[in-house]
Structure formats: C-alpha cells, structure tokens
C-alpha cells in the first residue's frame, strides 16, 4: 500500500511528524509521496523526504489556490527542487474553479508553466481538478505526448469525467472521499470502471478523514496509517481482495513515479 498524497508539511503534523510516519510503517504502508503546494511547501516537502530516504518522496509544484504567487523565481525554485532524487513529480498543479482563490486565468497560466516544466524535465505530473474539467483537459491534453505520466489526485468527478480522463491516459487517485456515504455515492459506483493499472490510492492527510471509520480518532485528523481502511472499501466496491489491491496500487505508484520496487 503506497500513499500517493500526504500533506506532511501541514502544521497539523508539526508536533508528531515522526510518529505519523512510524504509524504508517507499522500499518503496512510501503511509501509516502509528500505533496508540495507552493514554492515554500515544496522545499519543505523535499526536505522531509530527504530525511526519510527510500520511504518518502515528494512533489514540487504550485496548487491552483496559490497560482497568483507564480513568478520566474517560483519556476526557478521548482526546477532546482526537481533535480533532487527525492522529487519525483511536478505538482500539485491544475485548476480549481470551485472557490477561485486565484483568478482563473492566473490558474491557467501557472498550470501551463508547470506542464512546460514537467515536459522539459520529463517528469510525471500530480494534478488537481475541481469544477474545471473541460478547461483542465483543454490545457492538459496538448502536453500529454511530452509527459511520462500523470495522475488526477483526489478524483471526485462524474462518470463522464472519469471516462474522459481515462481516455486521455491519466491515472486516477482515490481518497477517503469514496468512504463518504453522502458525498461519495457516485464515486463509489465508478470504482469498478477504473482499470487496475491506473488506480492509485491516497489519504490526502491530514484532510479527508474517511467518514465511515470506526472508531474515529479523537483529533479527527487523517493520517497515512488509515490508508488500509480506504483500500478495504475500494476493494469491496471492486470485488477484489484488499491485499491484492494494495499490492497493485503500490506497483502502479512505483511505475508512475519511477521508484525502486
């Protein structure tokens, strides 16, 4: 079981980060990908991964919420970070028109710039898309022939959107959203449609604690050690054995991010 989306730089983990990683290992998690969401957090993510070689890796990128911060200096920082062996993908990048914390055109500009960087460096991309599917694919599609791979992190879209992403050759990241009996109803129905070699699993910790976890942790904070719960739910929806699904998703992550087996 490999967790491809952990916000380990979050201040929610400031007091017990080492224990969080230990609990993940004890729970059978085979590796963690630490998400970078702006220049500073990408540097922090790389630093955290460096201190945990062979178990943690990181991404370097600018989340659409931070797109207004994009600059030449940002691009230079990400490029420098991407030279580190611990940094295995560009992102989290993409479009988020749900809240438009950054203006849509700022988001498109930063997204294009990061896709260009990923193409230049021949690195996979770690993608974010919310309420922006058509524009997202319109921006992304021309770059796909130049990219070695891409995953849509925390996919929560419709069947039509899933089919479009799969047709474009994208991998699909599934979080504990699928465990939500209210918001995750449609997503649950889509689980059997994702090809086995395109499915990746993630907690997005400390966010998106699975709603159906019992007992719920007193802190209500999500952790990578809860990934087995997501694996179990997804396996049930796909009619598969959890152990086999965990191994498959681990192999998928290592192939996409070019990590040792």
Swiss-Prot record:
GO molecular function, one term: magnesium ion binding
EC number: 3.1.11.-, 3.1.13.-
Subcellular location per the Swiss-Prot or TrEMBL entry: Cytoplasm
Keyword Acetylation (UniProt): no
Group of enzyme by EC: hydrolase
CDD domains reported for this sequence: TatD_DNAse
Major subcellular site: cytoplasm
Annotated keywords: Cytoplasm, Exonuclease, Hydrolase, Magnesium, Metal-binding, Nuclease
Cofactor field: Mg(2+)
Binding site for a divalent metal cation: 92, 128, 153
Cellular compartments per GO CC: cytoplasm
Quaternary state and interactors: Monomer.
Family under the similarity heading: Belongs to the metallo-dependent hydrolases superfamily. TatD-type hydrolase family. TatD subfamily.
Function: 3'-5' exonuclease that prefers single-stranded DNA and RNA. May play a role in the H(2)O(2)-induced DNA damage repair.
Name by which UniProt lists this protein: 3'-5' ssDNA/RNA exonuclease TatD
Organism of derivation: Erwinia billingiae (strain Eb661)
Record lineage: Bacteria, Pseudomonadati, Pseudomonadota, Gammaproteobacteria, Enterobacterales
